[in-house]
Swiss-Prot record:
Function: Specifically methylates the N7 position of guanine in position 527 of 16S rRNA.
Molecular functions per Gene Ontology: rRNA (guanine-N7-)-methyltransferase activity
Catalyzed reactions per annotation: guanosine(527) in 16S rRNA + S-adenosyl-L-methionine = N(7)-methylguanosine(527) in 16S rRNA + S-adenosyl-L-homocysteine
EC numbers on record: 2.1.1.170
Biological source species: Polynucleobacter asymbioticus (strain DSM 18221 / CIP 109841 / QLW-P1DMWA-1)
Subcellular location: Cytoplasm
Family: Belongs to the methyltransferase superfamily. RNA methyltransferase RsmG family.
Binding site for S-adenosyl-L-methionine: G80, L85, V131, E132, R148
Keyword tags: Cytoplasm, Methyltransferase, rRNA processing, S-adenosyl-L-methionine, Transferase
Domain of life per record: Bacteria
Pfam families found in the cross-reference section: GidB
InterPro entries with a match to the protein in the record: rRNA_ssu_MeTfrase_G, SAM-dependent_MTases_sf
Listed name of the protein: Ribosomal RNA small subunit methyltransferase G
Length: 222
């Protein structure tokens, strides 16, 4: 895996990133690689190369997200953030977006807090708790929810719904099983706005970004 893979991926995705963006992504990569050796943040084989591809996978969602999020500073929750993917790369590239990283495993939230300080990311909040508990505390507070951690789309949507504002959006990062998972989603409850293929340079797997909005709305908290 060459040092230029991240730069090549950014170019092939058509993203216009500043030198500081790229430097911060590389620093995040270095910190994740270093912490992963001790804390096993993510199951990867070829550490730096694989994480680099995970970085590109994370920022590949940005063109679609920008189309669907007209707000200047949308509030977005990353459910099961793990090692900070996709939220940390998104926060680096979009400093006006406010991201809340929800993760129940404390060694992972310790890493997320470390990265927040190391990269001086003022636009992220790290919450060490279960998603269900956060939904009780911050019901109807988010413009969008995203995750790459959930293999069960229906479960992800159920957890996302209480967090969303009316007309909020869910961005589900999926692979080739997306069609099978969609069969378990009630179209009476959810409207599929987009099913976008994501072309990840140097990653020979199918990646898709589903964009959904709830048909049934939860009442806003009083």
């Amino acid at each position: 895996m060459t040092e230029g893979l991240l730069a090549l991926g950014i170019e092939q995705l058509g993203l216009d990133l500043s030198p500081q963006n790229v430097a911060d992504l590389e620093l995040f990569l270095q910190e994740m690689t270093r912490w992963n050796q001790v804390h096993n943040l993510t199951a990867i084989d070829n550490e730096e190369g694989s994480i680099r591809l995970h970085l590109i996978d994370s920022i590949a969602v940005l063109p679609v997200m920008r189309r669907f999020l007209p707000q200047q500073n949308p509030k977005i929750a990353d459910l099961g953030s793990g090692g900070g993917l996709p939220a940390i790369p998104i926060a680096i590239v979009e400093p006006n977006w406010r991201l809340t990283l929800i993760e129940a495993i404390r060694k992972k939230t310790a890493f997320l807090q470390h990265v927040r300080g190391k990269l001086k990311l003022k636009n992220i909040e790290v919450i060490s708790d279960r998603v269900e508990n956060v939904a009780l505390q911050q019901s109807g507070q988010f413009d969008a929810v995203i995750s790459r951690a959930f293999t069960n789309l229906a479960r992800f949507l159920d957890l996302s719904l209480p967090l969303l504002k009316p007309d909020g959006l869910v961005f589900a990062m999926k692979a080739k099983r997306a069609d099978e998972e969609m069969q378990n989603v009630s179209m009476q409850d959810w409207h599929l706005l987009a099913d976008e293929p994501l072309h990840i340079p140097n990653l020979a797997v199918e990646r898709r970004l589903l964009v959904l909005t709830p048909v049934r709305k939860l009442p806003l908290p009083i």
